[in-house]
Amino acid sequence: MTKKSDAPAIRFKGFSDTWEQRKFEEIAVRSSVICSDDTLPRVEYEDIVSGTGRLNKDIYAKQSSKSGIVFHQGDVLYGKLRPYLQNWLLPTFDGLAVGDFWVLQPQNADSSFLYRLIQSRQFDEVANQSTGTKMPRADWKLVSKTVFSIPSNISEQAAIGTYFTALDSLITLHQRKPFLMKWRTSDANRNQTNRLVL
């Protein structure tokens, strides 16, 4: 169901191709290969900083023999349990997704763009029309049939994904600045105190 769509008013220089209306299932497919290979790192809900797509620990240091869905670098992990928690990850390594994850493999789409698409307001609204009350889960039947407007040119998708990745890195850097300044100040004070004691 690929239909042409109006392109947004603001575009990256050099791109003039049309955008398309495509169902999510035409952009990504779910992997469901289960494995318990002890050599692969495991990613669980508790390992992801909610809403940031960052890991909060060295997952290679974890000891686990749990089974999980195999993912590869370039796949996108989406936490379908309680989707409002925004547990997502664009891994730069191969591993196992343990728990209620969708492992999404891009289809005629750039993985960084797909990663940004699952963070969009439209995707979030659809995913949060979930099933279950105590443990709500995103409904694949609903999400997979939802139509999204995407660039037909994969290079433009990659440019959009790269832009937002750089923006996230810049935001993270600025959020860490006060912490680093405080750390440097306390370290300088500690060094000054040590000099006085000697």
List the model feature ranges, each with a label.
Residues 1-198:
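Feature detects amphipathic, helix-rich regulatory segments
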